[in-house]
Amino acid sequence: MSDNIYSVSQLNSAARQMLEGNFSQIWLTGEISNFTQPVSGHWYLTLKDENAQVRCAMFRMKNLRVAFRPQNGMQVLVRANVSLYEPRGDYQLIIDSMHPAGEGLLQQQFEALKMKLAAEGLFAQNLKKTLPHFSKAVGIITSSTGAALQDILHILARRDPSLKVVIYPTAVQGKEATAEIVQMIELANARQEVDVLIVGRGGGSLEDLWCFNEEEVARAIFRSTLPIISAVGHETDVTIADFVADLRAPTPSAAAELVSRNQDELLQQLRHQQQRLDMAFDRLFTRKSQRLKQLALRLQNQHPQNQLRAQQAKNEQLTHRLQLAILRQFENTQQKFTALSVRLKQNPLPYRIQRYQQGLEQLKVRLNFCVNRQVTERQNKLATLCGKLDGLSPLKVLARGYSIAENPQGKAIVSVKDVNQGDFITTQVADGKIVSKVL
């Protein structure tokens, strides 16, 4: 007897792990029988051939992507994982995708090409070209007689009538379609007359849409310098062109929406931007006007004539203060002299008189010295101030080439607004006056 003794549960679990590990994602073809769909939405069926059968399950999230309704007796191609339902020990398939048997080979080719191009980097997001924000011209590569073209043109005309449209007619089904689509993509890139290309058609079966799964079309889309939007079939239809294109639109109508801008929305945006621009201009104008007024006031306060008047007033104040200081110094000295004279007269002693007389003579000498020194200092300071005053004299300013214009009332003209046409004005220059008439 073997040393390993399994329970039924252990055996079923080990068998399930072995099956799932060795039979993952296999392709299987067979005939449907015993098809059921309970309220859960899952599909349960049996796949069989003339010699055997196997139970299958396809869960609701997977079967929602199947484009047809399975029927008993239908031949299908499925991709599935082999598993085992442990509670009953039933061996079964968990189906991932299902196609009619006629489409099975095409689906296998689709998956193989998809893996090949993905490995080469044709689907890389960092290589996708950005669509222009505002398209000026759009190219449409599709059938000239198909409903997809009419849908695109109708939406473009409604949303953006000014948008230029260039149609590159081509077959979108049949043997010639692949070569013609490639030719039109290359033609559009050579002419460079549009900003973006829409490549697509309306809905159809897998065989009808197969030209958009061809490798030649995929590589032409990848080589294009113009951004390309793929718009093939309905939202549930997925092609190789969708993966390679710079952007996928679920329908041709959706592609038209992507490349056009609604004029009403644009006008609303323009009005909003205009309002913002007007508000910004008003704020700027107000700020600059206030600054101009401040500069005009500063210029008026710093006018040479105003500065001259202020300096003259300051010089007059200094001169008056100097005169008062000299007068007070003289009066103080005179008072001291008088007091000493009185004291001398009141003292009868001759030697005291003589001593006071000597002191008086000394005081006279000191007084004369102090007075002369004070007078000299004040005269020097006065001369300095007079020199500065003379430097600010209007005549000196005029001698340097400046002039002062006055209106008939004798008021200085500081602005063109201070005179009117026909007024006589007087212009003071260094050596005289000039009378002029405003024209």
Curated annotation (Swiss-Prot):
Catalytic class of the enzyme: hydrolase
GO biological process, one term: DNA catabolic process
Molecular function via GO: exodeoxyribonuclease VII activity; nucleic acid binding
Gene name per UniProt: xseA
Cellular component GO terms, alphabetical: cytoplasm; exodeoxyribonuclease VII complex
Main localization (coarse): cytoplasm
UniProt similarity note: Belongs to the XseA family.
Any single Pfam family the record assigns to this protein: Exonuc_VII_L
Protein name (record): Exodeoxyribonuclease 7 large subunit
Compartments where located: Cytoplasm
Gene source species: Haemophilus influenzae (strain 86-028NP)
Catalysed reaction, written as an equation: Exonucleolytic cleavage in either 5'- to 3'- or 3'- to 5'-direction to yield nucleoside 5'-phosphates
Subunit description: Heterooligomer composed of large and small subunits.
Coiled coil (residue ranges): none
Functional note: Bidirectionally degrades single-stranded DNA into large acid-insoluble oligonucleotides, which are then degraded further into small acid-soluble oligonucleotides.
CDD domains: ExoVII_LU_OBF
Keywords: Cytoplasm, Exonuclease, Hydrolase, Nuclease
Keyword ATP-binding set for record: no
NCBIfam families: xseA
EC number(s) stated in the UniProt entry for this protein: 3.1.11.6
